[in-house]
């Protein structure tokens, strides 16, 4: 009996499975929304784009929130959930206002409640002997549960560095990892944010002093060759995503990590894009527990090269 007549059906089935795989995956994003305060809140065009970007993601880290009145996230919840007749609703968890002086920022995580929930959270205390107060804005560490993904839970450590101290701050994330492991029985880690990890802020010779890079157990999804900046005049991989933990590394959807160029996607001029931010979001996907559970195409710690893109 010939198998040829069945080949169109098999091809269609494979395409369906691939589409289902993508639909069931969990998209995680990180976005520095430059100076996200009252003035940007009143820019309706910029806000429309920001909401579109958030809606692409199942969980998104927002940085550089400058909101002394705590209005930004409630406003976003209204835009995301207020007129929605769908069953999908967003929730959020936000840090306190962080910074050494009068200049303060907040980290916020927005997430789809049906897919993700918060298990625990804490603000990292930057008090190690000999290097007290390394972070300009201490990581707001959140442990998430995601019951429908292959990795059922993961810790996200966000970071927005000061450019001049990027090398030291990125290196210090290794100490944050150790601190979280002491507190929680967590195995899956995501470090992400605006690390300012490119161009003159982190020159090539500095990487040897960053434990997050020299330790091969930390897997970098956004490589040094990427450009996460909006301006055409710059090309720097400031924004990064780094994983730790075999389970979560193996759960990454192949070729899902990268930079989301919202300027191109939404056909904006450079000026219009800069009204939104001077950074592009970075992202990746985690496989669903129901999709390709036996796949051997996931990212491998052994095969992953430092600084390479998945």
Curated annotation (Swiss-Prot):
Belongs to the DNase I family. Disulfide bonds join 199-236. Gene3D superfamilies: Endonuclease/exonuclease/phosphatase (3.60.10.10). A motif (Nuclear localization signal) lies at residues 301-307. Keywords: ADP-ribosylation, Apoptosis, Calcium, Disulfide bond, Endonuclease, Hydrolase, Nuclease, Nucleus, Secreted, Signal. A motif (Bipartite nuclear localization signal) lies at residues 40-56. Residues 1-25 form the signal peptide. Seems to be synthesized as an inactive precursor protein and converted into an active mature enzyme by removal of the N-terminal precursor peptide during apoptosis. It comes from Rattus norvegicus. The active site is at 105, 160. InterPro entries: Deoxyribonuclease-1_AS (IPR018057), DNase_I (IPR016202), DNASE_I_2 (IPR033125), Endo/exonu/phosph_ase_sf (IPR036691), Endo/exonuclease/phosphatase (IPR005135). GO terms for biological process: apoptotic DNA fragmentation; DNA catabolic process; neutrophil activation involved in immune response; programmed cell death involved in cell development; regulation of acute inflammatory response; regulation of neutrophil mediated cytotoxicity. Its main location: nucleus. This is Deoxyribonuclease gamma. GO terms for cellular component: endoplasmic reticulum; extracellular region; nucleus. Detected at high levels in spleen, lymph nodes, thymus and liver. Observed also in kidney and testis, but not in brain or heart. It is found in: Nucleus; Secreted. Monomer. Has DNA hydrolytic activity. Is capable of both single- and double-stranded DNA cleavage, producing DNA fragments with 3'-OH ends. Can cleave chromatin to nucleosomal units and cleaves nucleosomal and liposome-coated DNA. Acts in internucleosomal DNA fragmentation (INDF) during apoptosis and necrosis. The role in apoptosis includes myogenic and neuronal differentiation, and BCR-mediated clonal deletion of self-reactive B cells. Is active on chromatin in apoptotic cell-derived membrane-coated microparticles and thus suppresses anti-DNA autoimmunity. One of its GO terms (molecular function) is DNA binding. Transmembrane segments: none annotated. Pfam families: Exo_endo_phos. The gene is Dnase1l3. Inhibited by zinc. Its EC number is 3.1.21.-. Residues 289-310 are annotated as: Not required for free DNA-nuclease activity but required for activity towards liposome-coated DNA. Its cofactor is Ca(2+); Mg(2+).
């Amino acid at each position: 009996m010939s198998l040829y007549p069945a080949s169109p059906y098999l091809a269609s089935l494979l395409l369906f499975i691939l589409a289902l795989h993508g639909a069931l995956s969990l998209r995680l994003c990180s976005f520095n929304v430059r100076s996200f305060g009252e003035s940007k809140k009143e820019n309706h065009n910029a806000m429309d784009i920001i909401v579109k970007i958030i809606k692409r993601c199942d969980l998104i880290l927002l940085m550089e929130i400058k909101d002394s009145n705590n209005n930004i996230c409630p406003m976003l919840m209204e835009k995301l959930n207020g007129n929605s007749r769908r069953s999908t609703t967003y929730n959020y968890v936000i840090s306190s206002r962080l910074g050494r002086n009068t200049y303060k920022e907040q980290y916020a995580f927005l997430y789809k409640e049906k897919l993700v929930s918060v298990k625990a959270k804490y603000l990292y205390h930057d008090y190690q002997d000999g290097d007290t107060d390394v972070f300009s804005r201490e990581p707001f560490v959140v442990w998430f549960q995601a019951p429908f993904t292959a990795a059922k839970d993961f810790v996200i450590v966000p970071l927005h560095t000061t450019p001049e101290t990027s090398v030291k701050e990125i290196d210090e994330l290794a100490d944050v990892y150790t601190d979280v492991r002491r507190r929680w029985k967590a195995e899956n880690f995501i470090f992400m944010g605006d690390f300012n990890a490119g161009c003159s802020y982190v020159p090539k010779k500095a990487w040897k002093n960053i434990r997050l890079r020299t330790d091969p157990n930390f897997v970098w999804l956004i490589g040094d060759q990427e450009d996460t900046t909006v301006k055409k005049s710059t090309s720097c991989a400031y924004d990064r995503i780094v994983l730790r933990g075999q389970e979560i590394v193996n759960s990454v959807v192949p070729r899902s990590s990268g930079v989301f160029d919202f300027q191109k996607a939404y056909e904006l001029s450079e000026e219009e894009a800069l009204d939104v931010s001077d950074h592009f979001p970075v992202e990746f996907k985690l496989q669903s527990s129901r999709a390709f559970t036996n796949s051997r195409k996931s990212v491998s710690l052994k095969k992953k090269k430092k600084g390479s893109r998945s």
